[in-house]
Amino acid sequence: MTQISRQQYADLYGPTIGDKIRLGDSDLYVEIEKDLRATYGDELQYGGGKTLRDGMGSENFLTQEAGCLDLVITNVTVIDAIQGVVKADVGIRNGRIVGLGKAGNPSTKDGVTRGLVTGASTDAISGEHLILTAGGMDTHVHYIAPQQVEAALSNGITTLWGGGIGPVDGTNGVTTTNGPWNLEMMLRSIEGLPINFGIQGKGNSTGIAPLIEQLEAGAAGFKVHEDYGATPATIRACLSVADEYDVSVAVHTDTLNESGYVEDTIAAFDGRSVHTYHSEGAGGGHAPDLLKVVGQNNILPSSTNPTLPCGKNSVAELFDMIMVCHNLNPKIPSDVAFAESRVRAETIVAESVLHDMGAISMIGSDSQAMGRLGETFLRAIQTADAMKKARGPLPEDAPGNDNFRVLRYIAKVTINPALTAGVGDVIGSIESGKFADLVLWEPAFFGVKPKLVLKGGLVAWANMGDPNASLPTPQPMYYRPMFAAYGSALQKTSITFVSRAAYDKGVADRFGLQRLVMPVSGTRVIGKAHMVRNSYLPNIEVDPQTFAVKVDGVHATVKPPQSISLNQLYFFS
């Protein structure tokens, strides 16, 4: 058999088992652990003189109806919280992932994976020198402006979870869409936006009826926020309805400790599943020791990207953010004290360490309300790199690569938010049967700027050159909406998630919705143990005077980095 060098093979088909890929300008390196394409020398490849030709890699007679793929991504490196770091062909049909393995024509190729047959119905993406991830999910979004969708897609985020009705003061501070009329208007509005949505209703009600009517009107979950009163009674009432209707509850706790301390809020949870937003506390919540929630097995903790990674300017920018978002007045001493109580350098530094240990399970943005929606994926990878430089290799990492650490951070922005919201059976990972929301990255731009964003198996967003040019690549190159973002294709490639109650009551027909509408499920049985690669339950102590954080008795701190990877090299501003 003819042999070629490893370098020549990588030039032709991309890296394979044992090869390492540097992620951007970071110090993170992933190593391909497994090659799912069975054997070498029979690779499927698109192009002139390549193998994806009729009678060669392309099967002659199989129709799409009979199982021929719609799209194949060839020879791509997959980085996925469930699959690991693997080399594979990835097949897509009818907007769903068929599987990973070896694609092609079983009449001419050995070892073609069942279901991954290519033919006349199949188009191709050459993944040889690209990285494939699941589309990201931002679990903490204030729906302040519809243009947020453009920022999200430009960083590989394909699902938004939050609430609001636009740039009103309530939405500037709280991620809820309050009441049936507002929910209906938002469900109608997002029909034209090429991204998945889940809308949270206002959970701040000790009365049951206002909560139920929001679920029946299309809310996919609840958010309890201190600006509307995050009291133990409110939390208990909201969780009781959530238990009955199988929806998630997110909570922004009581910064001022007016209705109780962190221990009282934890007691109000009563062991029930709950998602704690910005669990460090700079974004809001019990001061100064909200971090204790990350040690509870029923609590699914996330934090938000403005403090990740903790850099030399992180603390300085937070005060003004808080004043604007929560309608505070710098001339009122109590308002200033409120803002200052949330900004604690020690707990902000500890937040990054706890992420690195897998104790905080998710990262969201807190979009336009202290966070940056277009940087969620970016901040995850930046934090992973900053922590490697500060703390060294993780115990779980194999010698010579950072696979476990990278996969831990990928899980924080893909599968764990999906599981928490009750949509992990539909999105969040690259698994057979899941919706084909996928992101392709050039390794040099990993986590920063994707090459292609697929929604439901069709390209929705891409870095595209001059449409009048002779090639796709001439300048000016910038992100533009693609065909999945137009016409009725948009409605077949993006999902609106709602409660089962709304789904069963025909919310799509009632409101004339044309998008795919799917119910959430399984939210009340999720605990910290279900958080992929991020299930650590430490004992947390916070010194009330110095705010120093101890994790299992050890001071959790690092020096804030003076420079951060994937940063100014990649952006003009």
Curated annotation (Swiss-Prot):
The Urease domain, residue ranges: 135-573
A GO cellular-component term linked to this record: cytoplasm
Enzyme class (EC, first level): hydrolase
InterPro entries referenced in this protein's UniProt entry, alphabetically: Amidohydro-rel (IPR006680), Metal-dep_hydrolase_composite (IPR011059), Metal_Hydrolase (IPR032466), Rhodanese-like_dom (IPR001763), Urease_alpha_N_dom (IPR011612), Urease_alpha_subunit (IPR050112), Urease_AS (IPR017950), Urease_asu (IPR005848)
Gene3D superfamilies per record: Metal-dependent hydrolases, Urease, subunit C, domain 1
Annotated positions binding Ni(2+) 2: K223, H252, H278
Catalytic activity, reaction form: urea + 2 H2O + H(+) = hydrogencarbonate + 2 NH4(+)
Binding positions (substrate): H225
GO biological process, one term: urea catabolic process
UniProt entry tagged with the keyword Cytoplasm: yes
Annotated active site: H326
Record-given protein name: Urease subunit alpha 2
Pathway: Nitrogen metabolism; urea degradation; CO(2) and NH(3) from urea (urease route): step 1/1
Record SUPFAM superfamilies: Composite domain of metallo-dependent hydrolases, Metallo-dependent hydrolases
